[in-house]
Regions:
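Bacterial N-terminal signal peptides that target proteins for export
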Residues: 1-8
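Bacterial N-terminal signal peptides
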Residues: 8-17
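Bacterial Sec-dependent N-terminal signal peptides
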Residues: 16-43, 206, 325, 330, ...
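A short, Gly/Thr-enriched small/hydrophobic beta-strand-prone motif that recurs across taxa
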Residues: 26-53, 59, 64, 71-78, ...
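Tryptophan-paired
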Residues: 64-151, 205-324
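Edge beta-strands of extracellular beta-sandwich domains
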Residues: 147-156, 305-307, 456-464
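Extracellular beta-sheet/turn segments enriched in Thr/Pro/Gly and aliphatic residues
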Residues: 159-200, 207-211, 314-352
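Short, compositionally biased
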Residues: 294, 349-553
Length: 553
């Protein structure tokens, strides 16, 4: 076996560059008068933990998951990557860093780097002699990190050794590993040392199955979301990462994908139903697979859809931890768009997953997709509502949540008194109002989220062929505050962008043709109220004017 070795004991934080060949020792970092003794090191890789998959059938119109998500156990710059490795590649060892800590004082006594060039699992290394009982750590496939751990460093600090990574693989495209031998004495153990290594990353595998016969599902994106950036080399993380410490891994959108990722101790809760594993019910930093695409049921219309699959222990719906040296195998059979499964998101999201909510949503009727959704557990844009205008008579705090159980159409216009604005309004288990566009090219509707028969909140839906961000012109206006009055002293000049038409209008063109003029009216609002009323249905009147007809069913 050919082994390239670099020895390092550090007293100063000076970076020394070593240039060595096979079997050549670098001597620039060795502390004088430290005696070493040869030791034969044997390594093995502990298999990744996995479990028997559990099948959870959801029916023909749902997401059927066969989960192999089980808890198991076993930054300086390191690496993590997507792409399946063979078993041999997952076990391969490209290089090692050896760190020797004295048990008496818990300080680093010696470190060494060796490059294993022929794939063998044995190496002739050196350790400091005269140390007595010690603990020897071996890091594999992480490059030479001996320069990162100074001589005399505390073992407690070494155990926190970590790096930010951009994928899950280390040097030589092999997986980062760690192992240790406690209570080792090189002078009493026949100069032989055996260390079992476990991978410092988890493996996430997705196998995607085609839909029911006659249905079609076109995948547009498969991503692994909320992946921890920080890879802990030695010991597991004790806390969940922050939002800033998370990233996203992409894929080639094929039906068989593998990622290697750092562990993520996102936590657990009391969930017992797998259909409740969705955004509002899980830890904010939990890792999940997001599958997006267009689903077309047999004889139906294509709809944008997303499926969210959170990782965690396969036999515990409330577990969301991703742990090192563990396989998470997800066999996902896409079988429909069941809105009673919280992991299924039907329609294009108008509210950016609840981060950009509003009281009015505008959709383009010329888009191929006809299904939309918006978060309905937040009132409007989530702003605080003063008691003076609150429908409850009390202050509604900012981002105060509501808990609907169903949704319904309040009213809608119909183009030519026939073509409906909306074909469907419903409520999904994960807190979204879902609606499908009707045949009307221009229209308005009000939909409500309810708890049984009680309306909790309502929203205006404006559907138009003109809303392509080009068809509706925008004019910028500038305010001119008055001068000389105390009440206007703190008012500054502002700019506002205004559309060329009223909200809900089918046209912005001035005309004297009655039929076309009516299209410019849009909807009416009573001062202080957020929901619109249908506008006039005639251009001229003598007494009372007819309004545009509206329908509630």
């Amino acid at each position: 076996m050919k082994v390239t070795k670099f020895f390092g004991l550090w007293i100063l934080s000076v970076l020394c560059v070593l240039s060595c060949t096979d079997e050549e020792q670098g001597t620039g970092n060795i502390v004088p008068n430290v005696a070493t003794a040869p030791v034969k090191l044997s390594l093995d890789a502990t298999p990744m933990r996995g479990t028997v998959s559990t099948t959870r059938t959801r029916g023909d119109n749902s997401l059927d998951l066969v989960l192999g998500e089980e808890a198991g156990k076993t930054v300086n710059t390191a690496g993590t990557r997507a792409g399946t490795l063979t078993d041999a590649q997952e076990d391969a060892i490209n290089d090692i860093c050896v760190f020797q800590f004295g048990n008496a004082d818990g300080k680093l006594k010696y470190s060494e780097y060796a490059s294993l060039t022929d794939g063998q699992l044995t190496a002739n290394i050196s350790l400091a002699s005269g140390v007595g009982t010690c603990t020897v750590y071996v890091l594999a496939n992480v490059g030479d990190l001996t320069q990162k751990v100074s001589y005399g460093s505390a073992l407690a600090d070494f155990k926190k050794f970590a790096a930010e990574v951009s994928s899950g693989k280390g040097t030589g495209q092999n997986l980062p590993m760690c192992g240790y031998k406690a209570d080792f004495n090189s002078e009493a153990d026949n100069a032989s040392l055996t260390v079992s290594l476990t991978r410092a990353v988890a493996k996430v595998s997705l196998n995607l199955t085609t839909p029911n016969a006659g249905d079609a599902f076109a995948v547009t994106s498969v991503r692994l979301m909320n992946v921890a950036k920080k890879l802990y080399y030695v010991e597991s993380a004790t806390t969940a990462p922050t939002v800033a410490e998370l990233t996203t891994y992409t894929s080639d959108n094929t039906k068989s994908i593998a990622w290697y990722v750092p562990e993520n101790k996102a936590g657990s809760n009391s969930l017992t139903d797998w259909k409740d594993r969705y955004e509002d019910n899980v830890p904010a930093t939990a890792t999940y697979i997001l599958i997006e695409g267009s689903y077309t049921p047999k004889g139906g219309i294509a709809r944008d859809v997303a499926y969210t699959i959170y990782l965690g222990a396969g036999d515990k719906a409330g577990d969301f931890n991703v742990v090192r040296n563990t396989k998470y195998t997800i066999n996902a059979a896409i079988k429909g768009t069941n809105m009673n499964d919280g992991r299924v998101l039907v329609g294009k999201d108008l509210s950016a997953a609840g981060t950009q909510t509003a009281n009015c949503y505008v959709v383009n009727t010329t888009d191929a997709n006809k299904w939309y959704r918006f978060k309905a557990t937040i009132r409007g844009n989530g702003a605080e509502t003063p008691a003076q205008i609150s429908y409850t008579g009390a202050v509604i705090p900012a981002n105060d949540r509501i808990a609907p159980t169903n949704a319904a159409l309040v009213w809608e216009t119909r183009e030519g008194d026939k073509a409906p604005t909306l074909d469907y309004v419903g409520y999904s288990r994960n807190g979204y109002v879902v609606f499908k566009l009707g045949e009307a090219t221009e229209g308005n509707a009000v939909v409500a989220a309810k708890n049984g028969a009680t309306t909790l909140w309502s929203w205006h839906i404006w559907t138009t062929a003109a809303f392509d961000r080009n068809g509706i012109k925008v004019q910028t206006y500038e305010t001119r505050p008055r001068n000389g009055l105390a009440s206007y002293a703190n008012i500054t000049k502002r700019e506002f962008k205004m559309m060329d038409r009223n909200l809900g209008s089918a046209s912005g063109t001035a005309t004297k043709v009655a039929e076309e003029a009516i299209k410019t009216y849009g909807v009416y609002f009573q001062f202080g109220r957020k929901d619109p009323f249908p506008a006039a249905g005639v251009m001229t009147r003598t007494n009372d004017a007819d309004i545009v007809p509206v329908y509630d069913a």
